[in-house]
Amino acid sequence: MLHKNRVKNRTHMTSFRVIIISFFCLILVGTLLLMLPISSRQRCVTSFPDAMFTAVSATCVTGLVVKDTATYWSLFGQVVILMLIQIGGMGVITIGLAIIRASGRKIGLRQRSTMQESISAPQVGGIVKLTGFILKTSLIIEMIGAALLAPVFCNDLGIAKGLWYSLFHSISAFCNAGFDLFGIREPFSSLTFYHSNIYLNIIIMLLIITGGIGFLVWGDIRTHKHRIRRFSLQSKVVLMTSAVLIVLPALYFFFFEYDHGTIHDRTIHSLFQSVTTRTAGFNTTDLAAMDESGTAIMIILMLIGGSPGSTAGGMKTATFAVLFLSAITVLRRRNDVQCFKRRISNEAVCSAGAVLFMYLVLFFTSGVIISRVENLPLLTCLFETSSAIGTVGLTLGITSGLSAVSRVILMILMFFGRVGGLTLIYAALPSADSQNSRLPLEKISVG
């Protein structure tokens, strides 16, 4: 039995390391491709720091850029960026397993275990079928999104360019990347040109939400259809938390930030800002015009991020929900954290606390360092670091002007936010043997 546990732990740890190494390899390949003269419009070699920052941002589906995607990168460079977004969003392991399966080779237990960790699945059983479902559904949704965006972009840009823009922005939105090609109108302008186009705003929002709720929720929807009562606890928590984190911030933006214009414009702007802030990084309004309270709320939303096993980053909605429920449990003086008539394990509660601690320390420390190095306001730098660690991509306009030190910090945060804090820690530390004996219990005062 002890031997089996050690083998299991060794495989478990290997899975985490495989995930990290696969992302590193993808970033390296992307960096080298973006450095090629064919990748830039000027047909010049892009510097290693600029190419690597772009590759990290694309692979980690963030959207922070130091070179405007539309005006600096050639069509080849844009295709490379889009492929990095697609593979990074779906997960390198997911794509790899699909290739192995298509070649007819057998998928072993180690590969299945790695896939399980990659998408935060509760068990190894059925993981291969789930992988096929994820890829097939993702491609279908992205194609539908591109088809729905095509009338708008083809009308504005012509058929050929419009189709390319439709595909690019559909994949970018679904993968929660936030990369855009509208620097042709004004560099780093995102979707501000379409701020009044309700149809386009709705399509982009739906793509963002679909990609951000997580692959496991899709699996429940496929299996149980509309019978929500049969959904797993995680799916219920994710759907409930996501709905709350869309509606409440939207109400704030509606009443306090967008307090001018028609009801329709205020509603669509508020909803879009609420949806995109947690994961995607598109913006239709000038973020620098927001007051400090609005900026602070956006920082919190970016830190929370998307859902487990999704294309998004951040602490995750489930983590936020567990932290909230554990606080309620303490205040009500109960022993167990409960939700939807189920008990949440102490391991999940402790993991949520560890994730919160890591994110807050990294986010705040990095913001302070960048503020000192760049001599910029702390709130502006905290906005940037929360955007990076949440893999969101929103910025107050300082990214392209940052020094090498600050860019390295942002790259580390983006990688941390995409791969996951616990994955990095588990990969770096040796597995702990289970303790057969427990130490004496002693109380300590807190609060």
PLM feature segments, named:
Residues M1-G447:
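Membrane-proximal intracellular helices of multi-pass ion channels
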